[in-house]
Amino acid sequence: MRARPVLLAVISLLVAVAPAHAATKRLTLRAGPFNVNGFQTVWPTATVHNTGLNGYITKMDAELVDARGRRVLINKVMLHHVVFIDNARHYNSCPGRKGTPFFGTGEENEKLVLPAGYGYRTHKHDSWRMVAMFMSHHLQAKTVYLQYHVTIVTGRRMTDVLPMWLRADGCKVEPAYDVNGDGDPAQHNLQTTAWRMPVTGRIVAAGGHLHGGAYDLRVTQPRCGDRTIVNNAPRYGAPSDLVYHVFPVLHEPGPVATGWQLSKTGIPVRKGELLNVTGDYDQSEPHGRVMAITHLYVARDNRAPAGCEPLPSDIRTVWTRARGRSLPPRVTIPISRLSSSGKVVSVDRPPGDDVVTSAPDTVVSSALGGFGPANLSIPDGASVTWAFTDALAHNVSLASGPRGIYSPNFHGGSYTHQFTVPGTYKVFCYLHPLTMNQVVTVRP
């Protein structure tokens, strides 16, 4: 009778140590279809397929494709950004938000890659969702799918990573901020937020999301002299790159790549310590609705040193683009109209006579048909109130001018901006860019 527990214990031990059959699989999954009308910007959200497997994700990427699986070029529909969120996990850098963001990409074509031995733990019954932004640069409506590839390792244990989405502008509801453009060419706009680490461990991978005008995105460690431990530098396309030749221009083109940092050894961080995340943008010109978000992947390790040892020698940066420009190019966003032949053309000003006023505040009727008056001259210090008079969503966005003007999207209501710097301001609604554009001349 005494032998039985021993025998059962031996059997249990053998089962526990028996190696499972390890396998690596690359899955191709899709979300959609998503219908995008001509020159439309949409923000789709959807429940998406997970891997259907128990294992560890080691690689992931995403792109827009058509029904036959062919890549959709950005001169048709642009994937501005997408974030995949794991509803089964409950860590979020911003309290109160549901789920854990674990992969994101956009114009920079970021690809998730983890060092050997590390993976993001996933289960076959986990629930995933996506939030995204697509921008049409074509007159014709198009149906697109978000296709994503996931490499998953099953049948063996790996070191799990905790994804952390850390923004330079903190946990505001709106993940973007504006750079006003009131500096000289040598000045930078620095936006920094300190984030407290929830675990002790090692940063083994880090990516980043930036917009046009960005110089840098970095994470520094104050307890070690504020040294830089993560750098997600941008890489911009050559002047001939397609990103600079799509019309209408709905926003300032962003980087075509950002540096993805890897280290199998990992950079030690301690639970409770602060890390500073800084977005570094050009300050000499306005840049609207910019983002600076670093994506950290932290492996828990209670043995991670508490000192300030030299950074690991195996830190390296990989790029999805081999070549490009490191400094942000100057880009002027034109206002555009649809010609009589059905082509998108850049114009200096919309149709209509100048309306000259000395009033302290001018109300502009704003609807799908356009801004009225479309050409307005006001004195320095005066305000303009755009009154949105139809049921559609609209906004006011600077195309070019001395200072930034960037409203939220409105369904009705109004938006007021006071002009305090003389000059010529070209504005448009990026949701309806071919009909809703305006020139405001501010007189000294």
Locations of the language-model features?
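Bacterial N-terminal signal peptides
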Residues: 8-16
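Sec/Tat signal peptide C-region and signal peptidase I cleavage site
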Residues: 18-22
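Bacterial N-terminal signal peptides that target proteins for export
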Residues: 1-7
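Extracytoplasmic copper-binding redox domains, predominantly the cupredoxin/blue-copper superfamily
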Residues: 341-444
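Beta-strand-centric surfaces of beta-sandwich/beta-rich domains
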Residues: 23-202, 207-342
